[in-house]
């Protein structure tokens, strides 16, 4: 399938654009405060998008994560038109300017005391941040991504030089068949181009919207089971893999 718009998390984000992905691990018992925090930030993100400082924002709540130290509770995406815009936004971000803007945008919804209380709380225990860039994806079926949609997430560590070719030439065609069978909404393959100091040693990520697929439903080479199984085996051995499931709860869409 030909390359199309990168429609993974919001309606319009094209090849060449990047996403900054924050995997957020909360302090114990901080879930309600975290929702208040995101609701406070939401009008700020929407205004930044309107001013063309970024192109999108979305928050996913993890339903199922791997057993690991400080497993993430939420996944937050900020989308930018290119790497330069993302870097410029992060390098020039001024908290005092942002705070005043947030107060102005929320003056009819939250008091200054509420804002101050939330901002002074330690809600996030750790944030593992990755900047990712799209390599390729299937087309998207079933309309726009919306609140309540499900995300199947995979984080990979590349183990050999053939890994990307296996994703693009073995696994992507299999996911395209799952899409044609109505089992998924979209599959996307991204590469990590930057990360913060506490981020894990991951090189790539895959994302599947509304995944109802059975891996046994589709073979890559249906006429040769041995060759099909060998290709899949070598593809799986070309990377380390952890997976998780999440639900979309906030979006600029």
PLM feature segments, named:
Residues 2-15:
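Sec-dependent N-terminal signal peptides
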């Amino acid at each position: 399938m030909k390359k199309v718009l990168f429609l993974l998390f919001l309606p319009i984000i094209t090849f060449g654009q990047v996403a900054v992905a924050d995997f957020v691990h909360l302090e114990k018992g901080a879930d309600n405060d975290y929702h208040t925090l995101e609701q406070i930030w939401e009008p700020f993100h929407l205004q930044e998008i309107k001013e063309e400082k970024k192109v999108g924002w979305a928050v996913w709540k993890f339903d199922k994560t791997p057993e690991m130290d400080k497993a993430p509770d939420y996944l937050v995406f900020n989308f930018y038109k290119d790497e330069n815009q993302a870097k410029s936004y992060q390098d020039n971000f001024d908290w005092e300017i942002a705070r005043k803007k947030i107060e102005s945008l929320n003056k009819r919804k939250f008091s200054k005391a509420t804002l101050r209380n939330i901002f002074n709380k330690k809600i996030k225990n750790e944030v593992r941040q990755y900047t990712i860039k799209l390599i390729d994806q299937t087309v998207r079926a079933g309309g726009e991504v919306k609140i309540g949609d499900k995300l199947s997430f995979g984080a990979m560590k590349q183990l050999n030089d053939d890994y990307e070719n296996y994703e693009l030439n073995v696994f992507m065609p299999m996911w395209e068949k799952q899409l044609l069978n109505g089992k998924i909404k979209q599959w996307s393959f991204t590469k990590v181009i930057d990360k913060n100091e506490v981020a894990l040693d991951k090189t790539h990520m895959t994302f599947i919207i509304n995944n109802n697929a059975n891996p046994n439903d589709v073979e890559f080479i249906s006429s040769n089971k041995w060759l099909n199984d060998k290709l899949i085996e070598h593809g799986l051995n070309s990377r380390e893999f952890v997976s998780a499931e999440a639900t979309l709860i906030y979006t600029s869409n």
